[in-house]
């Protein structure tokens, strides 16, 4: 995968690590990348995952002429994930609110995985996502897709803010969200109840 991802480390790289489903918002991200490419011609975006929207995503990449900006890497293993996180500056996954769908957005483990690497996230105010990404603390929460371009632009242009959000995300992941620490908290809670 290292050969497939030839990235310029001097420019921020965005990542979506999720199944390719309509509700994960890939189409909105690609539209934003297209819009922002006018300002940042070298913007880089990695899509890791597979799903029923793969062909649609490929068509959109071609229609927006983003072949040199977007890398589709498919399903990745843990070692590949570590490599990709080492190349990522911004995690982005603006899930669509599908209130009446069979599947809703849970906590968002991918955000926490990114946080462990000091990567801030851009996410939607949907389901359990605001519990995983704290707005203006560990990333940015958007309320609608009109805010997506501006949120990406904010983190691309403001490196210091991006670094601070990433550090906050990493500290929170290490100190509050690691499973072992959660188990201790739950055990204490159970003991207190008894």
Regions found by a protein language model. Name each.
Residues 135-146, 154-160:
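Conserved acidic donor-binding segment of nucleotide-sugar-dependent glycosyltransferases
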Residues 86-104, 119:
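Acidic donor-binding loop of glycosyltransferase active sites
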Residues 55, 77-88, 116, 134:
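Short acidic alpha-helix that forms the nucleotide-activated donor recognition element
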Residues 154, 161-176, 182-188:
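A short, well-ordered alpha-helix in the C-terminal region of glycosyltransferases
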Residues 58-79, 90:
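Nucleotide-activated donor-binding/catalytic signature segment of Leloir-type glycosyltransferases, i.e.
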Residues 102, 123-136, 140-143:
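Short acidic/histidine- and often glycine-rich active-site loop of Leloir-type glycosyltransferases
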Residues 111, 115-116, 120-123, 133:
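Short hydrophobic beta-strand element within catalytic cores of glycosyltransferases
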Residues 7-24, 30-33:
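Conserved donor-binding/catalytic core segment of Leloir-type glycosyltransferases
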């Amino acid at each position: 995968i290292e050969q497939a991802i030839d990235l310029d480390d001097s420019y921020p790289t965005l990542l979506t690590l999720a199944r390719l489903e309509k509700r994960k918002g890939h189409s909105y991200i690609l539209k934003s990348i297209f819009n922002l490419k006018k300002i940042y011609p070298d913007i880089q975006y990695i899509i890791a995952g597979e799903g029923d929207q793969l062909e649609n995503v490929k068509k959109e990449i071609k229609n927006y002429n983003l072949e040199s900006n977007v890398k589709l890497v498919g399903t990745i293993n843990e070692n590949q994930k570590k490599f990709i996180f080492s190349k990522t500056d911004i995690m982005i996954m603006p899930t669509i609110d599908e209130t009446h769908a069979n599947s809703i957005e849970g906590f968002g483990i991918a955000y926490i995985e990114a946080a462990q690497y000091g990567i801030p996230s851009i996410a939607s105010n949907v389901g359990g996502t605001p519990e995983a990404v704290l707005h203006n603390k560990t990333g940015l929460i958007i309320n609608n897709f009109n805010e997506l371009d501006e949120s990406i632009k904010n983190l691309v242009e403001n490196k210091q803010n991006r670094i601070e959000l990433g550090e906050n995300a990493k500290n929170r992941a290490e100190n509050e969200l690691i499973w072992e620490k959660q188990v201790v908290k739950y055990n204490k809670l159970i003991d207190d109840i008894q």
